[in-house]
Amino acid sequence: MGSYLPSTSGEREQMLADLGFDSTDDLYAIVPEAARAGELDLPSGLTELELREKLGAMAAENTVFRSVFRGAGAYRRFVPALVKTVISKEEFVTAYTPYQAEVSQGVLQSIFEYQSMVCELTGMDVSNASLYDGATAAAEAVFMCQDRKRSGVVVSATVNPQTIETVKTYCESRGVEVEVIPAKGGATDAPAFAAALGEATACAIIQQPNYFGILEDAGDLIEAIHAAGAKAIMAADPVSLGILASPGELGVDICVAEGQSLGLPLSFGGPYLGIIACTSALMRKLPGRIVGQTQDAQGNRAFVLTLQAREQHIRREKASSNVCSNEALCALAAGTYLACMGPDGLARAASSSYAKAHYLAERLCEIDGFDLAWDAPFMNEFATTCPLDPAALERALAERGVLMGLPIEFVPDAASGGSGTSEAAAQGRPHGSPERGILWCATEMNSKAQIDEAVELVKEWAR
């Protein structure tokens, strides 16, 4: 154990002697007895074998699902072994962009490569070094769009409910009005959405694919946003961008995304990764760190933190954001994942997810009472009706090692006479979802055998 201790017993005795004390108790005698912690009731140490057994017993108490059919913003995807190998290197194991950053050229280059790949994936001009998660990235994007004349925010109800609540939380303290437009048929109600845009609207947020997996008519929505003089923010699924049109191609001003799908495990909800990228016109409003490429005094390529005048350590309370410490290690994982997969690998993952989700939907619709909630194109998530209690089905499948889709509740479409401000909506439940429905998901991790097994279990329960 000597190598794990800062000093030996002999060194401690020498230090006490130099200070004129005979023991450690004499050293702390000046501390009142009532303020001392006393003896700590800690168990005795364990051998490595005993520790392995104890941790193994604790881990065995976890519920581990053989197959997962739940997404709703967090996805079980394949992670190449190289990702964990790279982020486990001691040179990288920190969440910080280092102080005296230019000394750490390797860290800066890894962030620069991440930024470059994010820009290539999203079709945007500039990316930062990452944010905390997709929801906070959306909130930061809203603040990028604020000015003296425009501050209002319009959000489609088909955006992830957690993102909507995060945006509302960020905006509340600044007195920024957030208007959520109810869905129609599981997608954005385009006429209502366009009607909500006005001279005071700073930005509008849409999601592609949306929370229910449906592919929005994004081009028309973005055109309506720009026609009103507002900025368009798109929350994108990064893996789906392997086959879908990029936000840049669609004319988006700011793209945000949850980067968990890019090489990060589900891991009890975090840490995840906030991706944000924008057009060059908004570059100086980007929050957080940005790494740039330049030349040193000898003419060699070098990497630096650039445009730092935006940041809180320079501008203090006038900074565009208070983000400082970031998700650098998670960004490294995402960058490594993208480098491993390449454009072709990402496209295969997206195509496989699409095909398996549609196969799952086809099989589920064979069961009486299970129907697609909406007749609309979807990516790798979809909602179905459920004839009985979804919570009971969830428990039944969990006992067999299968995590089914997320139970969701019905909020009537605005067009059908329902209120967009019902109690269910106020509780953060998604608008326009089917009564007693289930939001299913499939990725490249779901085999045909797993899908068939899950469908048979649902059939067995539904009899």
Regions found by a protein language model. Give the residues of each.
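PLP-dependent enzyme catalytic core of the Aspartate aminotransferase-like
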Residues: G2, E11, A17, S116, ...
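Compact, charge-rich alpha-helical regulatory domains located at protein termini
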Residues: M1-E39
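N-terminal entrance/gating region of PLP-dependent enzymes' catalytic architecture
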Residues: A37-E113
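Conserved PLP-enzyme active-site core in the AAT-like
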Residues: T136-N300, G369, T384, A391-R395, ...
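Gly-rich Lys/Arg/Thr-decorated short loops/hinges at beta-loop-alpha junctions or inter-strand turns
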Residues: K89-A101, M117-G123, K149-R150, C171-E179, ...
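Short loop-beta-helix segment that forms the pyridoxal 5′-phosphate
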Residues: Y99-V103, C119-A139
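Active-site C-terminal subdomain of aminotransferase-like
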Residues: L262-D368, L372-D375
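Terminal amphipathic helices with adjacent charged low-complexity linkers/tails
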Residues: Q146-R150, S173-A183, A373-F410, P434-I438, ...
